[in-house]
Amino acid sequence: MSMVYANIFLAFIMSLMGLLMYRSHLMSSLLCLEGMMLSLFVMMTVTILSNHFTLASMAPIVLLVFAACEAALGLSLLVMVSNTYGTDYVQNLNLLQC
């Protein structure tokens, strides 16, 4: 495994550990999820470019679209929770159930 792959994998693991450790606030969880998606995007792009997979060249773009949709939904949920309760604690999400 080259150093590029090791660094990208380390970035993914650090984002995952951040998501597991700092899950009390919604904003920190969203930032960790974005870090995970960014490292996955870079890993897919580097792998596809280094192995010359021409048929899979659209996969990183699709992943980036899903990451943008996830970020938009997460930010709208963050705005809704912060307007309703005044804080961005994840424990407030259980109160949103009907």
Swiss-Prot record:
One CC-aspect GO term: mitochondrial inner membrane
Primary location recorded for the protein, binned into one broad class: mitochondrion
GO molecular function: NADH dehydrogenase (ubiquinone) activity
Record-level GO BP terms: ATP synthesis coupled electron transport
UniProt keyword Cytoplasm, yes or no: no
Pfam families: Oxidored_q2 (PF00420)
Membrane topology, as annotated: Multi-pass membrane protein
EC code: 7.1.1.2
Its job: Core subunit of the mitochondrial membrane respiratory chain NADH dehydrogenase (Complex I) which catalyzes electron transfer from NADH through the respiratory chain, using ubiquinone as an electron acceptor. Part of the enzyme membrane arm which is embedded in the lipid bilayer and involved in proton translocation.
Protein name (record): NADH-ubiquinone oxidoreductase chain 4L
Annotated source species: Cystophora cristata (Hooded seal)
